UniProtKB/Swiss-Prot annotation:
The gene is ssb. It comes from Thermotoga maritima (strain ATCC 43589 / DSM 3109 / JCM 10099 / NBRC 100826 / MSB8). HAMAP family: SSB. One of its GO terms (biological process) is DNA replication. Residues 4-108 form the SSB domain. Residues 116-141 have a biased composition (Acidic residues). This is Single-stranded DNA-binding protein. Homotetramer.
Length: 141
């Protein structure tokens, strides 16, 4: 039996992305997007709500996110839902859902005078950078 874990979201960045690096030097960029949930037609008591998703990118996609994404930009994110687990200094176990993205695309346009040629032509890699075990000097097979 095979299982499937894929999530596609469209939302706006709630703040500028944050960048850090793994111990091996791989760039990691995180950002949060707000996604509106529209009320159902058959449920008049439903109110529009907003969900917030933490997005994580690795490698070249992380460099792209750091360089071109800013607060307020509308983006499409495609990736996998993961559960990040850690323990606090007091020994309390925590779990937090996050989306490990392998595709990030603009869904809006910046005003023409602020868009760089590089930004509009950039092809976002659709590779899986969720593993920190690769080396750029080694072939991928």
């Amino acid at each position: 039996m095979s299982f499937f874990n894929k999530i596609i979201l469209i939302g706006r960045l709630v703040r500028d992305p944050e960048e850090r690096y793994t111990l091996s030097g791989t760039p990691v960029t995180t950002f949060t997007i707000a996604v509106d949930r529209v009320p159902r037609k058959n449920a008049p008591d439903d109110a529009q709500t907003t969900d917030f998703f933490r997005i994580v990118t690795f490698g070249r996609l992380a460099e792209f996110a750091r360089t071109y994404l800013t607060k307020g930009r509308l983006v499409l994110v495609e990736g996998e839902m993961r559960m990040r687990r850690w323990e606090t200094p007091t020994g309390e176990k925590r779990v937090s859902p996050e989306v490990v993205a392998n595709v990030v695309r603009f869904m809006d346009r910046k005003p023409a005078e602020t868009v760089s040629e590089t930004e509009e032509e950039l092809e976002i890699p659709e590779e899986d950078f969720s593993s920190d075990t690769f080396s750029e000097d080694e072939p991928p097979f």
